[in-house]
Amino acid sequence: MVLEIVFFTSCLILSVVGVYLNLCYLRATHRSTVYPKFTGNNLRFLSVAHIVLACSNVVAAAAMWGANVNRTTKSEAFFSTTLSVSRAIPALTVFWTTVERITYNRSPTIRESPKFRYVAVFRVIEVVVSVIMEMIIRGIYLNSDDQLKEAAGLEVLQSSNDEISIKSSLIANVYYDFYHGILFLPCIIISVLMFKSAKGSHTRACLLGGMRNDQKIQNLSGQMTFFKNSYIMLYIACLADFILHVIVKRFINLEDSTLDMMYINARCFLPIVYPLSLIANNKNLRIDYFGNFILCRKARNLHKESKVKVIATRESQESIIANLKMIGILSDVDTSQGGAGAASLAMMGMGGGGAPRPPSGGRMASISKDPNSITSSGSLAKQSTASMGSGGASGMMMFHTRPKSSVPSMGSVG
């Protein structure tokens, strides 16, 4: 009983971690340009499939802990079928990623302008093919001679009201191991051949100065980048998940109930490593991922609020100074020194390349050399000054207007 509680708690924690990591990945890749559109949509769809897998693990662990779902043939059939379907797509992550790479490489339409119907059709194919293959393999195993004899014996025991223990067909079915394991070999062979072909074509195009085929060169470069940054780590993660399942199902001899709980915990591994494998070698995606690691919008934006305010304040200061210079109200100010520096220069009469002019009689000297210009030190200073920085009175800017004779009529500032 204690061991079951430990396994259930660990399954719950691992499943929650897997769901959260995949939600962070979905948030980070929303409208992201790290991957091409078709590739990004496929990876996001696979991430959703891993979320479904993690949620099914929680439900399965709760059902196994709260009720003896593997004590009758009917309950075991429903239990195994549900778990098999929920893992149908995640178990083929490498396969569908390889198929997407082939489709992306061979189809200019998908590569250049992938419409939603292409993405939808590809997703439907993924779901239908994965589920059908899982059901076919399960049917082949259950209809074998050994399983038919075992099922007949279990029906006799069940009719006598004796408590029986049925080993889950998910664990006993060896065809699943051959089916999932044999797909890794062609996937890696096809990927290596595509990588070598893309690398050779890209090298020849660059040596021949083939910038006329710029779109093709970018496509080949994208193939190589995806293989190095994402595919290799994803392949290693999925292969490790497959090896973990084989070890749990074939090399550990425990009671059926304990082995079932260990198998459910092993299913929690893939939803965790899937998003981590995609961001491991991809620097740009890793930055976006950790930038969106806090899913709560308020909490995520809280640490950005002060930085955004500083940027907005600096841009506002530079915009105000540029507008005043453009309409001739303010003399030239070096805005490259930032808002506060420009404000201090304007206050001290150091506009443009002019030399500083000391104040006379305790009053600020005018920047303009025109004797007819008007220096507003009263109400105009109160109405037209901008506080640059946090300097209080030292943040005042002296605006020097044009002579009265050159001031245009009302309604137009010129």
From Swiss-Prot:
GO cellular component: membrane
Major localisation: membrane
Membrane found in the keyword field: yes
UniProt keywords, alphabetically: Membrane, Transmembrane, Transmembrane helix
Compositional bias ranges of the Polar residues kind: 369-383, 404-414
Protein origin, superkingdom: Eukaryota
Annotated stretches, region: Disordered: 351-414
UniProt key word Iron: no
Subcellular location, record wording: Membrane
Bilayer topology term: Multi-pass membrane protein
Spans through the membrane: 1-21, 45-65, 124-144, 175-195, 232-252, 259-279, 336-356
Name of the molecule in the record: Uncharacterized protein ZK1320.5
Lineage of origin: Eukaryota, Metazoa, Ecdysozoa, Nematoda, Chromadorea
